[in-house]
Protein backbone atom coordinates (compact mmCIF):
# COMPACT_ATOMS: atom_id res chain seq x y z
CA UNK A 1 0.00 0.00 0.00
CA UNK A 2 1.78 3.13 -1.21
CA UNK A 3 -0.81 5.67 -0.04
CA UNK A 4 -3.14 5.75 2.96
CA UNK A 5 -6.09 7.78 1.70
CA UNK A 6 -9.07 5.87 3.09
CA UNK A 7 -10.08 2.54 4.59
CA UNK A 8 -10.34 0.12 1.67
CA UNK A 9 -11.45 -3.48 1.32
CA UNK A 10 -7.89 -4.69 0.72
CA UNK A 11 -6.68 -3.18 4.02
CA UNK A 12 -6.22 -5.78 6.76
CA UNK A 13 -7.54 -3.63 9.59
CA UNK A 14 -7.31 -6.39 12.20
CA UNK A 15 -3.62 -6.92 11.45
CA UNK A 16 -3.04 -3.15 11.55
CA UNK A 17 -4.70 -2.93 14.97
CA UNK A 18 -2.59 -5.82 16.28
CA UNK A 19 0.60 -4.11 15.08
CA UNK A 20 -0.50 -0.83 16.67
CA UNK A 21 -1.18 -2.54 19.99
CA UNK A 22 2.27 -4.13 19.89
CA UNK A 23 3.82 -0.72 19.23
CA UNK A 24 1.94 0.76 22.19
CA UNK A 25 3.69 -1.80 24.41
CA UNK A 26 7.11 -1.20 22.82
CA UNK A 27 6.88 2.24 21.17
CA UNK A 28 10.58 2.52 20.31
CA UNK A 29 11.11 -0.96 18.87
CA UNK A 30 11.27 0.40 15.30
CA UNK A 31 13.09 3.66 16.04
CA UNK A 32 15.69 2.89 13.35
CA UNK A 33 13.06 2.30 10.65
CA UNK A 34 12.69 5.97 9.75
CA UNK A 35 16.32 6.99 10.18
CA UNK A 36 17.30 9.71 7.67
CA UNK A 37 13.69 9.86 6.46
CA UNK A 38 11.50 12.99 6.52
CA UNK A 39 7.75 13.18 7.08
CA UNK A 40 6.16 16.35 5.72
CA UNK A 41 2.94 17.49 7.40
CA UNK A 42 0.88 19.87 5.26
CA UNK A 43 -2.02 21.56 7.03
CA UNK A 44 -4.69 23.39 5.09
CA UNK A 45 -6.84 23.38 8.25
CA UNK A 46 -6.19 23.44 12.01
CA UNK A 47 -5.32 20.32 13.96
CA UNK A 48 -4.54 19.37 17.54
CA UNK A 49 -4.75 15.60 18.21
CA UNK A 50 -3.99 14.45 14.68
CA UNK A 51 -1.00 16.74 14.38
CA UNK A 52 0.52 15.85 17.74
CA UNK A 53 -0.10 12.11 17.43
CA UNK A 54 1.29 11.97 13.88
CA UNK A 55 4.40 13.90 14.88
CA UNK A 56 4.87 11.64 17.91
CA UNK A 57 4.48 8.52 15.75
CA UNK A 58 7.09 9.79 13.29
CA UNK A 59 9.52 10.57 16.10
CA UNK A 60 9.08 7.09 17.57
CA UNK A 61 9.99 5.66 14.16
CA UNK A 62 13.13 7.79 14.07
CA UNK A 63 11.87 10.20 11.40
CA UNK A 64 12.44 13.92 11.09
CA UNK A 65 9.28 16.02 10.74
CA UNK A 66 8.69 19.15 8.65
CA UNK A 67 5.44 21.07 9.21
CA UNK A 68 3.85 23.67 6.94
CA UNK A 69 0.58 25.51 7.49
CA UNK A 70 -0.64 26.26 3.99
CA UNK A 71 -3.36 28.61 5.22
CA UNK A 72 -0.77 31.13 6.46
CA UNK A 73 2.73 30.12 5.33
CA UNK A 74 2.47 29.21 1.65
CA UNK A 75 1.33 30.58 -1.68
CA UNK A 76 -2.24 29.79 -2.66
CA UNK A 77 -2.33 26.74 -4.95
CA UNK A 78 -4.13 26.39 -8.28
CA UNK A 79 -5.52 22.89 -8.90
CA UNK A 80 -7.13 23.29 -12.32
CA UNK A 81 -5.15 22.52 -15.48
CA UNK A 82 -5.02 25.08 -18.27
CA UNK A 83 -5.56 28.01 -15.92
CA UNK A 84 -3.71 31.25 -16.61
CA UNK A 85 -1.66 31.95 -13.49
CA UNK A 86 -2.46 35.62 -13.26
CA UNK A 87 -4.86 35.69 -10.33
CA UNK A 88 -4.57 35.17 -6.60
CA UNK A 89 -3.10 31.68 -6.87
CA UNK A 90 0.65 31.88 -7.38
CA UNK A 91 1.58 28.19 -7.33
CA UNK A 92 0.30 25.28 -9.41
CA UNK A 93 -0.19 21.87 -7.82
CA UNK A 94 2.00 20.21 -10.47
CA UNK A 95 5.07 22.12 -9.33
CA UNK A 96 4.12 22.35 -5.64
CA UNK A 97 3.71 18.58 -5.27
CA UNK A 98 7.02 17.96 -7.00
CA UNK A 99 8.84 20.44 -4.77
CA UNK A 100 7.39 18.87 -1.62
CA UNK A 101 8.39 15.42 -2.92
CA UNK A 102 12.02 16.52 -3.25
CA UNK A 103 12.26 17.31 0.45
CA UNK A 104 9.98 14.68 2.01
CA UNK A 105 9.91 10.88 1.93
CA UNK A 106 6.25 10.74 3.03
CA UNK A 107 3.67 13.54 2.91
CA UNK A 108 0.65 13.72 5.22
CA UNK A 109 -2.13 16.18 4.34
CA UNK A 110 -5.08 17.67 6.22
CA UNK A 111 -7.62 19.47 4.01
CA UNK A 112 -11.25 19.82 5.10
CA UNK A 113 -14.38 20.14 3.01
CA UNK A 114 -15.39 23.69 2.10
CA UNK A 115 -19.06 22.84 2.84
CA UNK A 116 -20.05 25.17 -0.01
CA UNK A 117 -19.84 22.79 -2.98
CA UNK A 118 -20.66 19.16 -2.23
CA UNK A 119 -19.58 17.81 -5.61
CA UNK A 120 -16.24 19.58 -5.39
CA UNK A 121 -15.73 18.48 -1.80
CA UNK A 122 -16.40 14.85 -2.69
CA UNK A 123 -13.83 15.04 -5.49
CA UNK A 124 -11.13 15.54 -2.81
CA UNK A 125 -9.25 17.87 -5.13
CA UNK A 126 -6.44 18.75 -2.68
CA UNK A 127 -5.68 15.20 -1.57
CA UNK A 128 -6.14 13.61 -4.99
CA UNK A 129 -4.05 16.27 -6.73
CA UNK A 130 -1.12 15.73 -4.39
CA UNK A 131 -1.55 11.99 -4.85
CA UNK A 132 -1.46 12.45 -8.63
CA UNK A 133 1.58 14.71 -8.88
CA UNK A 134 3.71 13.77 -5.86
CA UNK A 135 6.33 11.05 -6.23
CA UNK A 136 6.19 9.96 -2.57
CA UNK A 137 3.49 8.23 -0.48
CA UNK A 138 0.52 10.34 0.67
CA UNK A 139 -1.23 9.95 4.03
CA UNK A 140 -4.67 11.42 4.77
CA UNK A 141 -4.80 13.31 8.10
CA UNK A 142 -8.49 14.16 7.42
CA UNK A 143 -9.97 15.25 4.17
CA UNK A 144 -13.41 16.28 2.96
CA UNK A 145 -14.83 12.76 3.16
CA UNK A 146 -12.48 10.59 5.23
CA UNK A 147 -10.33 10.45 8.36
CA UNK A 148 -8.70 6.99 8.23
CA UNK A 149 -6.17 7.68 10.99
CA UNK A 150 -9.01 8.47 13.40
CA UNK A 151 -10.86 5.32 12.33
CA UNK A 152 -7.80 3.17 13.04
CA UNK A 153 -7.46 4.82 16.45
CA UNK A 154 -11.15 4.10 17.09
CA UNK A 155 -10.63 0.46 16.08
CA UNK A 156 -7.75 0.18 18.57
CA UNK A 157 -9.92 1.65 21.34
CA UNK A 158 -12.74 -0.77 20.57
CA UNK A 159 -10.31 -3.69 20.61
CA UNK A 160 -8.93 -2.66 23.99
CA UNK A 161 -12.39 -2.34 25.56
CA UNK A 162 -14.21 -5.09 23.65
CA UNK A 163 -16.59 -7.13 25.85
CA UNK A 164 -16.86 -10.90 25.64
CA UNK A 165 -20.30 -10.72 24.06
CA UNK A 166 -21.33 -9.08 20.78
CA UNK A 167 -21.62 -5.38 21.73
CA UNK A 168 -24.03 -2.75 20.49
CA UNK A 169 -22.28 0.36 19.22
CA UNK A 170 -24.17 3.55 18.40
CA UNK A 171 -22.88 6.39 16.23
CA UNK A 172 -24.68 9.67 16.84
CA UNK A 173 -24.20 13.41 16.45
CA UNK A 174 -23.38 16.02 19.08
CA UNK A 175 -23.56 19.84 18.87
CA UNK A 176 -20.48 21.72 17.69
CA UNK A 177 -19.82 25.48 17.37
CA UNK A 178 -18.92 25.04 13.68
CA UNK A 179 -20.42 23.08 10.83
CA UNK A 180 -18.34 19.95 10.27
CA UNK A 181 -17.97 17.54 7.32
CA UNK A 182 -18.78 13.83 7.48
CA UNK A 183 -15.16 12.69 7.30
CA UNK A 184 -14.87 11.20 10.79
CA UNK A 185 -18.29 9.55 10.68
CA UNK A 186 -17.69 8.16 7.18
CA UNK A 187 -14.46 6.46 8.19
CA UNK A 188 -15.98 5.17 11.43
CA UNK A 189 -18.78 3.51 9.45
CA UNK A 190 -16.25 1.88 7.11
CA UNK A 191 -14.22 0.69 10.07
CA UNK A 192 -17.29 -0.83 11.74
CA UNK A 193 -18.02 -2.88 8.63
CA UNK A 194 -15.19 -5.22 9.69
CA UNK A 195 -16.29 -5.50 13.32
CA UNK A 196 -18.51 -8.18 14.86
CA UNK A 197 -20.94 -5.78 16.52
CA UNK A 198 -24.55 -4.62 16.48
CA UNK A 199 -23.88 -1.24 14.86
CA UNK A 200 -26.52 1.50 14.75
CA UNK A 201 -26.44 5.05 13.34
CA UNK A 202 -28.87 7.50 14.93
CA UNK A 203 -29.23 11.19 14.07
CA UNK A 204 -31.74 14.02 13.66
CA UNK A 205 -33.72 13.99 10.42
CA UNK A 206 -31.86 15.78 7.64
CA UNK A 207 -28.39 14.90 8.94
CA UNK A 208 -28.00 11.59 7.13
CA UNK A 209 -24.65 10.29 5.90
CA UNK A 210 -24.12 9.48 2.23
CA UNK A 211 -25.94 6.25 1.33
CA UNK A 212 -22.84 5.10 -0.57
CA UNK A 213 -21.13 4.93 2.84
CA UNK A 214 -23.95 3.45 4.91
CA UNK A 215 -25.58 0.99 2.49
CA UNK A 216 -23.27 -1.83 3.53
What are these regions (language model features)?
Residues 12-15, 129, 212:
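Exposed alpha-helical structural elements
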Residues 1-52, 56:
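Positively charged, low-complexity intrinsically disordered leader regions
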Residues 44-66, 159-216:
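Glycine-rich phosphate/diphosphate-binding loop of Rossmann-like nucleotide-binding domains
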Residues 19-20, 45, 110-112, 141-143, ...:
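Fold-independent oxyanion-binding glycine-rich loops
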Residues 11, 72, 145, 176, ...:
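Residue-level detector of flexible, active-site-proximal loop/helix-junction positions
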Residues 34-40, 48-159:
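Phosphate/diphosphate ligand-binding glycine-rich loop within oxidoreductases
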Residues 21-25, 155-159, 189:
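Generic structural signal for well-ordered alpha-helical scaffold segments
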Amino acid sequence: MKNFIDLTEDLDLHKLVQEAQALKKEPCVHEALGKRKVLGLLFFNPSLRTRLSTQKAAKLLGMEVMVMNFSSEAWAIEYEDGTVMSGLRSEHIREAAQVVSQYCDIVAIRAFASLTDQEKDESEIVLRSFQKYASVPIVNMESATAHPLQAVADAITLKEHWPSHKPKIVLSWAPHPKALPHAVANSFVKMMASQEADFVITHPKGYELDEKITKG
